Amino acid sequence: MQKILVTGATGFVGQHLIEYLKLDGYNIRAISRKLIPGVDTVICDFLEDDIPENALKDIDIVFHLAGYAHDLKNEPGIEQTYQKINVNVTVDLLSLSAKHNVKKFIFVSSAKAGGSPVRGVCAAEKDQNDPAGIYGKTKREAELKILEKGRKSSTHVSILRPALIYGPKVKGNLQLMMQGIKKGWFPPLPETGNQRSMIHVDDVVQALLLLASDQRSNDEIFIVTDGKTYSSRDIYEIMCST
């Protein structure tokens, strides 16, 4: 059975990925700031520590989910934090993966890496629009660097750009919105005609597992959605009905 390394294992997607990998009987290791029950855990804080080289020993596939997404524009040093976590750590982890002959490196990027969406136009992987915001810019920079580096090594790189992810244990704005609706303080949203793509966390996990098993994904970027579009009003009504 293949040995898997997961970063960001305690995050929203990471928790679901770990559950699926356990069910399928994979040998799992995680890099995390805290011990994960039932998982071989290498303790590391990417913001403070170098990546422990022993974390990559005997690993076949890396799922790199860890990233920095907090939009705290006025926080001192915030740009350096984005650069270190989203770019430097990603490149360093791929370098160590190549050194240890890891077969596949799968990077979870973001739809924001493809640039700001154009109303009424379906985004494509080949789009080269300028990403808006430091989060999208650093994710795009990481993509370009690891694709180039991967082509020069024996470690194949695949990149996933998920749309807004929803599902059990969701965090961030969707979590706050659900809490507000349940407690009665979130106001009804009008229909404005805005549209956005989304994807269920289980579908993201299935996409990751497919990238790991299909060689056609080598050195490629993939945008994933659930195939539908939602307005803010749609999301509000769905949450009210659950």
Where are these regions (language model features)?
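N-terminal Rossmann NAD(P)H-binding glycine-rich loop of SDR-like oxidoreductase domains
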Residues: 4-24
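NAD(P)H-binding glycine-rich loop region in Rossmannoid oxidoreductase-like domains
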Residues: 46-88, 92, 96-99, 113-114
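A conserved pocket-lining segment of Rossmann-fold NAD(P)-dependent short-chain dehydrogenase/reductase
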Residues: 74, 179-199, 203, 207-211, ...
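Short alpha-helix in the Rossmann-fold core of NAD(P)-dependent oxidoreductases
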Residues: 83-90, 106, 138-139, 197
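Conserved Rossmann-fold NAD(P)-dependent oxidoreductase catalytic core, especially the SDR/UDP-sugar
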Residues: 91-134, 150
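Active-site Tyr-X1-5-Lys
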Residues: 130-158
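Flexible, glycine-rich beta-alpha linker
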Residues: 155-175
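Mid/C-terminal beta-alpha module of Rossmann-like enzyme folds, strongest
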Residues: 214-242
